[in-house]
Amino acid sequence: MKPRRHWWVWIFVGLYIWMIFRNSLMIAEASSALSAKVAYRLIAIINRYGFYIDFYTFHHYVRKLAHFAEFAGLGFLVTMAMHICPLFKSRFLNFVLFLIAIPAIDETIQQYVDGRSSQYFDMLIDGGGFLFGGLVCYVLVLIIKDLLFRKNRQEKTA
């Protein structure tokens, strides 16, 4: 049996998941204040260019984008960790386990936090972000492998 030398990459995945769960444990007021601060800064930038947006609508989209971005980062990290040291023989199982389990646990945590609620739509956004991050990582891995393959082939022919 082949020893798993690079298991430490999963520590980064675990720390990132902890960060996601920590954000979900914020009470509604703190979470809303944090995203409102981001929304105000973005609206100030957008207003400079002559576009005016309703704050409450924009704030809603900032919150949804935060869900997407959090899980895009997770998808990227999980895909990278899968390429380095898969947890299971099936890379598909590795990916799907995180794709389904982490958003479900995240939304379940929010059910028990003061002022927060669990929403299926957020799970879909989380899953979409995870898939996007995984796809970006996969494409980057393919590009890097292709560049290395070309470099090796050029060295052999020279």
Which residues does each PLM region occupy?
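Membrane-spanning helices that line or support transport/gating and their immediate boundary helices
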Residues: 33, 108-111, 143-147
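Interfacial helix-loop-helix junctions of multi-pass membrane proteins
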Residues: 103-127
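Short, charged juxtamembrane terminal tails flanking transmembrane helices
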Residues: 151-158
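Membrane-embedded alpha-helical segments that form the functional core of polytopic membrane enzymes
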Residues: 89-102
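"…centered on the first transmembrane helix and the immediately adjacent amphipathic helix/loop
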Residues: 1-72, 76
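Membrane-interfacial alpha-helical segments at the cytosolic side of multi-pass membrane proteins
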Residues: 70-85, 129-144
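Membrane-interface helix-boundary motifs at transmembrane edges
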Residues: 2-5, 82-90
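Alpha-helical transmembrane segments of multi-pass membrane proteins
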Residues: 16-23, 99-106, 134
